[in-house]
């Protein structure tokens, strides 16, 4: 199985998502973050489960949609996947954001 490495910025993204949602509902914030985390675990078993990020169009940079969030990840090699960002689907994503 492939190891999944969370970048510092992806961890920060997850914290910001939690804090934003928790302002209204701590319970829903926990549910949302747990859902994202569990879907990320599925990437380790099937790295190509996500689609190629349309804005980037590189085979190794992919995304998995979880609710209204895009989990952007890079297949670094046969043994490692890096979680690059977690973006709300309404936000624009440019190469400079990775």
Which residues fall in each region the model found?
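Basic, Lys/Arg-enriched alpha-helical interface segments
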Residues: 3-60
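Basic/aromatic recognition patch in beta-strand/loop cores that engages polyanionic ligands
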Residues: 49-77
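Enriched for short, Lys/Arg-rich terminal
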Residues: 66-69, 74-98
């Amino acid at each position: 199985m492939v190891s999944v490495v969370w970048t510092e910025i992806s961890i920060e993204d997850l914290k910001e998502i939690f804090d934003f949602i928790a302002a209204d509902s701590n319970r829903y914030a926990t549910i949302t973050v747990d859902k994202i985390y569990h879907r990320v675990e599925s990437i380790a078993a099937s790295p190509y489960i996500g689609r190629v990020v349309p804005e980037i169009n590189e085979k190794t940079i992919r995304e998995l949609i979880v609710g209204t969030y895009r989990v952007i990840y890079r297949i670094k090699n046969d043994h490692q996947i890096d979680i690059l960002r977690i973006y709300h689907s309404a936000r624009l994503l440019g190469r400079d954001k990775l």
